[in-house]
Amino acid sequence: MDFKKTIFWAAFSMSGLMLYNNWQVHEGKPSLFGGAPASAPAVADKATTNNKVDVPTQISGAPSVAATPIINGGAIESAEKFTLQNDVLVLEISASGANVIDAKLLKSLTAENKPVELFQYTPTHKYFARSGLVSLNNNDLPNHTSTFKLVQSGKDGSGRPFAVFASERNGVRLEKTFILNPGSYVVDVGHRVTQSTSNPNPLVLYTEIVRDASQEQKIGPFGGAFSANTFTGPVAYTDKEKFNKLEFSAIDKNKITIPTLVAAGEPAWIAMVQHYFASAWIPGDKVARDIYTGRIDNGLYRIGMQTPLGMVGPGSTVVEKAKLFVGPQEERVLETIAPGFELLKDYGYLTILAKPIFWLLDNIHFYVGNWGWSIILLTILIKLVFFPLSAASYKSMARMKEVQPRLVAMKEQYKGEPQKLNQAMMEMYRKEKINPLGGCLPVVIQIPVFISLYWVLLSSVETRGAPWILWIHDLSVPDPYYILPVIMAVSMFVQTKLNPTPPDPIQAKVMMYMPIVFSVMFFFFPAGLVLYWVVNNLLSIAQQWQINQMFGKKPAK
């Protein structure tokens, strides 16, 4: 029995320790297992001009993307800015490069009840989208540093807000068209290129997302430990290689291995992700494209994609369409945008379990309309699924409790004779048909489910700002009054009392104080996760009490 209890608490302790370690890392603190979080490079207060070419040619016969100035002597700050808005998104587009330098998400609010500002261009934080042209013949073409003019704006025939910006250099005119769809975080972006010179130009369109490596602002509605991100940085998706996370630290060390060449017709996109939110370019897939990433001066990082436009002859016009996503990682929405786009939502290493758990939780919420009650119903369903295993476990524990006096007597009888004691215990287990390890299997099986649910609640923007009842106004952050952790501590204490008392005094004390230790740790977990654990404990107590009553009437032989 001692061995069984040791395995039980070792498994439970390890799962709790892993979750606490995740919280430490998320908060930017050193991991319990060594290794401090990488510090973010400082972002210069004032950007400088850099004309260095730092992205090599990767598409055969295509020009490289020049790392033209990230800004042009403060041009973005001083340039005229234009606003484009629908019912969920407000974009700010700078005349310098026609870059999208600000994006406010009207349906996602901060602690100050203001819209989350995902894209920003400030002295302390830079995160924006840009695009432009390069050519083998002439790099001085309309790019992300050129001055663009607003040539048309308003609403199209479908009532969609739009704006058209244009710039011309060396006989090449680039028009960028931005169209917002109602209720959508996806921006339709068109690049129309017209060649007026007598010499044909092999042109390449590049689309990039640029940001610094600083952690995103604490944008949970009520702050808290779990406002921190799961992963912040560039990601790339191709149909062949699937989803690739690119750490800022790996980019610094040139240790990035991503599929650079994307075949024609193969779905691919590039993005920047952070906790709850993401931005992405989804170019067309008619031709082969090239993915690249790197660090730019001033502590800025970029990920981009080159799309060859071919040889553009005199008087010719080429139009290349793309989509720019700027918004929350709502799984139902992400699935409709592009192949593999739902992978932007990070479930960690247990995605295979977390995705169906979220699917079930989301469908329950569809009918219930409250995420707190949805978590409770999900807990009941999970408990029903594991009921046969749990019943077997509790029966085994109840039988162990029955023979507890006999085990104590055996320890006295065979004191100093461990071999005879083990033989006597095994013989008793055989006669009573007791498996001393029978209570461990359900615990071991449920640990991955518990960790998967942890990632579901941590990663799901759907629960961000979602209330339950009374004092719980946001299930994604810790309980502000610690009521749920206290209830959980009491429930764990009751559970230990329903279990057989370990004969070892030290082990008995460990089991007595374990609920307190874990409850303190759960003070920092999202209220939704603690709610799941509380309900699970209460159901377990009811089930175990019933089984104890059933077997308590049967005396041990």
Curated annotation (Swiss-Prot):
Keywords: Cell inner membrane, Cell membrane, Chaperone, Membrane, Protein transport, Transmembrane, Transmembrane helix, Transport. The chain crosses the membrane at residues 371-391, 437-457, 515-535. It is found in: Cell inner membrane. The keyword S-adenosyl-L-methionine does not apply. It is a multi-pass membrane protein. Required for the insertion and/or proper folding and/or complex formation of integral membrane proteins into the membrane. Involved in integration of membrane proteins that insert both dependently and independently of the Sec translocase complex, as well as at least some lipoproteins. Aids folding of multispanning membrane proteins. Belongs to the OXA1/ALB3/YidC family. Type 1 subfamily. GO terms for cellular component: plasma membrane. GO terms for biological process: protein insertion into membrane; protein transport. Gene3D superfamilies: 2.70.98.90. GO terms for molecular function: membrane insertase activity. The keyword Chaperone applies. NCBIfam families: PRK01318.1-3, PRK01318.1-4, yidC_nterm, yidC_oxa1_cterm. This is Membrane protein insertase YidC. Interacts with the Sec translocase complex via SecD. Specifically interacts with transmembrane segments of nascent integral membrane proteins during membrane integration. Its main location: membrane. InterPro entries: Membr_insert_YidC (IPR019998), Membr_insert_YidC_N (IPR028053), YidC/ALB3/OXA1/COX18 (IPR001708), YidC/Oxa/ALB_C (IPR028055), YidC_ALB_C (IPR047196), YidC_periplasmic_sf (IPR038221).
